Structures are given as structure tokens and as C-alpha cells.
């Protein structure tokens, strides 16, 4: 919060400290605060916005940036000079990390701008931000961004993957090392739930049930 240092708040709330120098396990369901190796020194016209790396999200590792005096996560205010911290909470898999492991990223920006729906419509028309498998530009109405939809047909009946509940530890610094089948089970069209919507003509619709806390 405003006027507070993260290091001082950790003295009040942290249960214990440990080193990441030789590697450490971050357990599923626990919350960790880690001081990052990097500091920033921004001028008054520069600010930052952070977000997890895509690989971090694919492992369901909840990660967000914290700075001293911040009132919002993931935000580095203009002119900030000081340390950076990450809140890390593995949700599905326990992970092995070490000093130098990269879980999130920071974008430095000058000023503030946002792409309007009109600008997105122009890009969609001339570039095709979203396309079909046949490379046709989709004409969907753009509102607060480009809409995306779930594919419940899939390729060869495969529509997604569900994380296994009991798996081995994942070393996040070994990309491409593990077999997908060890951590994920396939979701196919056979897993769809069908509901009879029209008893007169026997038509039905299908959907996928998403269980709470499943990934």
C-alpha cells in the first residue's frame, strides 16, 4: 500500500525465509514473495506494466509483480525507483525454481495509449487479426477487443487437455524436457455433455463441463 515498503511488510507476515541459490521447491497451493534480481529507476515520463510469461500461465503458476508503495499489482508507477518483488503461487503443479528463473516480464512505456474498437475493426478488415482455419478473416463484432470463442469440435476429435491431479515436480528451467502425457490428459468430443433442447425434432446441443479449481 501507499507509503509501505514490501520488505517491512514481510517482517510482519512472512512465516519463514529460504534461499533460491541452489534451487527450491515452490509447493502447489502456497504463496511466496520473492525479491527479484532487477531494480528499476524510471524517469517521470516512464511507467511499467507487468504480466506472467506465457509459459508461466501454461503451468498455472499465479504470478504478479509488487513494488514499494504500490496500490495495484502489476503496476510500476511513473518515476518509480526501487526494488521489484514477485508474488508466486503454483495452483496445479509444484515447481522447482532457482536464482535467475524467469516467471514474469515487465514492459516499460512512455505515456498511455489504448487501441480503440474502431482501430481494431480497421486492422481486422485489412490485416485479419482473427482468422478461420481457411485463413478467412472473421467478421465478428469487435467490442472492447477482438472476440475469441472456444472450439468444441477440435482436430481429430481433440478439443483440449486437462491437468492431472498427481504429478511429479516440474523444473521450470527445463523447457521441452517433460512428456506432455505425464502432466496432461486429453479432452475429446467424447467428454462433451449433450442436452436435449427440442423434444419434437430430437435436436440436442453439447457442452463441456468445467470443474471448479480444475485446470
Describe the residue ranges of each PLM region:
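DUTPase catalytic domain/fold
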Residues: 1-215
Amino acid at each position: 500500500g501507499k507509503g509501505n515498503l514490501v520488505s517491512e511488510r514481510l517482517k510482519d507476515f512472512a512465516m519463514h525465509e529460504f534461499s533460491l541459490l541452489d534451487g527450491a521447491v515452490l509447493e502447489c497451493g502456497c504463496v511466496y514473495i520473492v525479491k527479484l534480481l532487477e531494480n528499476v529507476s524510471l524517469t517521470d515520463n516512464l511507467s511499467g506494466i507487468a504480466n506472467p510469461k506465457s509459459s508461466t500461465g501454461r503451468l498455472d503458476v499465479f504470478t504478479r509483480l509488487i513494488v514499494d508503495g504500490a496500490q495495484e499489482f502489476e503496476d510500476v508507477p511513473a518515476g518509480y525507483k526501487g526494488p521489484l518483488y514477485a508474488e508466486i503461487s503454483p495452483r496445479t503443479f509444484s515447481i522447482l525454481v532457482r536464482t535467475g528463473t524467469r516467471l514474469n516480464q515487465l514492459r516499460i512505456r512512455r505515456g498511455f495509449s489504448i487501441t480503440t474498437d474502431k482501430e481494431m475493426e480497421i486492422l481486422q478488415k485489412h490485416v485479419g487479426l482473427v482468422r478461420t482455419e481457411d485463413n478467412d478473416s472473421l467478421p465478428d463484432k469487435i467490442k472492447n477487443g477482438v472476440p475469441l470463442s472456444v472450439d468444441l469440435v477440435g482436430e481429430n476429435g481433440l478439443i483440449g487437455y486437462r491437468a492431472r491431479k498427481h504429478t511429479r515436480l516440474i523444473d521450470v528451467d527445463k523447457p521441452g524436457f517433460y512428456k506432455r502425457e505425464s502432466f496432461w490428459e486429453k479432452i475429446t468430443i467424447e467428454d462433451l455433455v449433450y442436452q436435449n433442447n427440442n423434444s419434437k425434432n430430437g435436436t440436442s446441443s453439447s457442452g463441456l463441463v468445467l470443474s471448479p479449481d480444475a485446470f
